[in-house]
Curated annotation (Swiss-Prot):
It comes from the Bacteria. Its main location: cytoplasm. One of its GO terms (molecular function) is zinc ion binding. GO terms for cellular component: cytoplasm. Zn(2+) binds at C108, C111, C129, C132. Transcription factor that acts by binding directly to the RNA polymerase (RNAP). Required for negative regulation of rRNA expression and positive regulation of several amino acid biosynthesis promoters. Also required for regulation of fis expression. It comes from Haemophilus influenzae (strain ATCC 51907 / DSM 11121 / KW20 / Rd). SUPFAM superfamilies: DnaK suppressor protein DksA, alpha-hairpin domain, Glucocorticoid receptor-like (DNA-binding domain). The lineage of its organism: Bacteria, Pseudomonadati, Pseudomonadota, Gammaproteobacteria, Pasteurellales. A zinc finger (dksA C4-type) spans 108-132. This is RNA polymerase-binding transcription factor DksA.
Amino acid sequence: MSRASLSLLDLAGVKPYQMKKDEEYMNEEQILHFRKILNAWHEQIVEEASRTVAHMQDEVTNFPDPADRATQEEEFSLELRNRDRERKLMKKIEATLKKLDTDDFGYCDCCGEEIGIRRLEARPTADLCIDCKTLAEIREKQVAG
């Protein structure tokens, strides 16, 4: 199985966090859990970017056939678009890591409520609770539609 197909928890080598009875939300153990996940995710993206650069350098061939050259250019273009998306994701991961340092992590940017451990394990960069995210998506559809 490639690293890209692993879940974030598998990638970080952690199990789903098990809350203990009366455990405080976003305590040091939980912060460490999410820091591991975010650092592993960041590292994976850096590795993918390095592989892309190496692949593009290895694959540069001056094809005499215009169709072959166009195919290669399209493949490179797709890879570069993917890397651009990942670059933006890396910035979001880095911003989330900073939130871990300032005790802002895990709380909704809109209403201040807890985002929840399971939601954060699925999407550690989430900055809205599920209710606020749902409302934001509804508003977005109304504006677009």
